[in-house]
Amino acid sequence: MYGPKDHGWIEVVAGPMYSGKTEELIRRIRRAEIAKQKVQVFKPEIDNRYSKQDVVSHAGDKIQSVPVKSSKEILEKLLDDTDVIGIDEAQFFDDSLVEIVSKIANNNRRVICAGLDMDFKGEPFGPMPKLMAIAEFVDKIQAVCMVCNNPATRTQRLINGKPAKKSDPVVLIGAQESYEARCRKCHCVPR
């Protein structure tokens, strides 16, 4: 999506783990670069699974990013000539991300946020619900359920091969060994 320079907007790519959110973010950023637009990509500093510096998809696609400690730091590190801003793992930021993203879009810039819309409990995750509400464009993508192969909309956390309990902490960064994509029917959160 490219538009006139006098319009900004917000795009959100949401879904469970292994649905291709980061791949889609990278694809959109690369297309903006092809369109000769200046881009910057940000990610939360706590996301260091595959790289401390780059945004990396589970499939191995990667793009250079600026790791930040807080959403406010995005404004501090945002360059004046940037046209398109990518934000990966948006769910890990606090609610001030919503105001910051709005401010950036109101300054005639395109903002693309990617993140989990629900936590492992199946509940709205961080600022994602509000970002989805204010965005001009929302793509909710699915993965494949690792149990029944139907479309998956949820992320199942596994601890020693068993579903995590509702009382477990929400934030625990991991990869395949601790998470699976699941459909509504196969998703399980014991009390």
Swiss-Prot record:
Listed InterPro entries: P-loop_NTPase, Thymidine_kinase, Thymidine_kinase_CS
GO molecular function term, any single one: ATP binding
Active-site feature positions: E89 (proton acceptor)
EC class name: transferase
Biological-process GO terms, alphabetical: DNA biosynthetic process; thymidine metabolic process
Record GO cellular component, one term: cytosol
Keyword ATP-binding: yes
Chain positions recorded as ATP binding sites: G15, P16, M17, Y18, S19, G20, K21, T22, D88, E89, A90, Q91
Catalyzed reactions: thymidine + ATP = dTMP + ADP + H(+)
Subcellular localization, as worded in the UniProt entry: Cytoplasm
Primary localization class, coarse: cytoplasm
Enzyme Commission identifier(s): 2.7.1.21
Statement: the UniProt record of this protein carries the keyword Cytoplasm: yes
Keywords: ATP-binding, Cytoplasm, DNA synthesis, Kinase, Metal-binding, Nucleotide-binding, Transferase, Zinc
UniProt binding sites for Zn(2+): C145, C148, C183, C186
PANTHER family to which the protein is assigned, alphabetical: THYMIDINE KINASE, THYMIDINE KINASE, CYTOSOLIC
Family recorded in the similarity comment: Belongs to the thymidine kinase family.
Subunit comment: Homotetramer.
Protein name: Thymidine kinase
UniProt organism field: Clostridium botulinum (strain Kyoto / Type A2)
